[in-house]
Amino acid sequence: MSHILDKIDTVYPFPPKPIPLSEEEKSSYIASIKELLKQKDAVLIAHYYTDPEIQALAEETGGFVGDSLEMAKFGNRHPASTLIIAGVRFMGESAKILTPEKRILMPTLEAECSLDLGCPADKFSEFCDAHPDHTVVVYANTSAAVKARADWVVTSSIALEIVEHLDAEDKPIIWGPDRHLGSYIANKTGADMLLWQGECVVHDEFSADALRKMKSVYPDAAILVHPESPASVVELADAVGSTSQLIKAAKELPYQQMIVATDKGIFFKMQQLVPEKELIEAPTAGAGATCRSCAHCPWMAMNGLKAIEKALSEGGEEHEIFVDEALRVKSLIPLNRMLDFAEQLNMQVKGNA
C-alpha cells in the first residue's frame, strides 16, 4: 500500500545543447584526452546515457561504461589516482563517497538530475522528521546530503528485496525521490510506503498510448521499460529493470526487435551485445517536436569531448567534486547497509540510471 503525496508539477530549466563539433575537432579533442589521461594518471568512467562517442572513448582508453553504482565501484577498484566521471553530479558524489582518497573530476558540475533537483535535502529532512516512525529508503539518484538522512540507500536491482525485508519487519517506509519507481515497488511488495513526488524528466515522458500504437506497428517486438517510467508504461513491458538489467534482457529475450523505454544513450552498449537485433526508441509523450527530453537526458549531453578535455587540462573548482567528510561518512552508512544486505543474499548489486 502506498500513500502518495500531492504531485507538484515542476518544469526544470534545461541547459543549452552543446555546440556540435566537426570531425576534425573531435579527432583533436580525442587525441588530447588520451594524452591527458596518461599525464594525469586518470581513467575515464562514463554512464550508459552519455553520448556514444564518450562511451567508446572510455572503453578504448581502458576506462569503463556502466550504471551509477558500477561506475563508483569501478573507480574504487581502479589504480588511477584521478577519476573523470562522465555523468551527472550525484554520480561524481557517489564516487567520492566510496573513494575519498582519489581526485574526482567531472566535465561539468552543472550536469544535474531531475530526481536530485526534485528532492532538496532540507525539504526531504522536514518530511522525514514529520514521520519519525518510518524507515527512510532513498534511491541512489540523490545528493550526498539526502543519502546521509536515509536509513537505506538502494538501487533498482535490489530495492524490491530490501523493501520486502523491511515490510516483513512491519516497518512503514518513506521512499524518495522517484514516485514511479516507488509505486512500482509498493505494488510489487504491498509495503506501507509514503512516496516523495520526484520523477526523471526522461522516463516521465514515455507514453502508454503512443507505445501501444508503436507495438501495433512492431507486433513481434519485445518492450523493455525502466521502472522510473509511469505505471501505464510499465504495465506494457515484457521486461522491467535498471539499465544493466535491460541490457541483459535484450540479450536473453528471444525477440529480434526491441522497443526500449529508457534514455537512448543505452543503445550503444545494448547494440554491442545484440548486433543482430533491431533496437527501437520508445515514443515519448510529446510524439516528436513537442517533447522536452525526447528520450535523452539534457544534462548527460553536457558531457562532451571539449568539456572532458577542459576538466583534465584545467581541473579546479569548476570540475572537482568535494564532499564534506562528516557528510561522506554519514552517507556511507546506508550505502554500506545495502551492500552488506546484498552480500548476505549473494546478490550482485547493480545501479539504477
Swiss-Prot record:
Signal peptide span: none
Descriptive protein name: Quinolinate synthase
Subcellular locations according to the entry: Cytoplasm
GO cellular component: cytosol
Pfam families cross-referenced by the UniProt entry: NadA
Entry cofactors: [4Fe-4S] cluster
Gene: nadA
Transcription is among the record's keywords: no
Residues that, per the record, bind iminosuccinate: H47, S68, Y139, A140, N141, S156, H226, P227, E228, T243
Cofactor note: Binds 1 [4Fe-4S] cluster per subunit.
Protein task: Catalyzes the condensation of iminoaspartate with dihydroxyacetone phosphate to form quinolinate.
GO biological processes: 'de novo' NAD biosynthetic process from L-aspartate
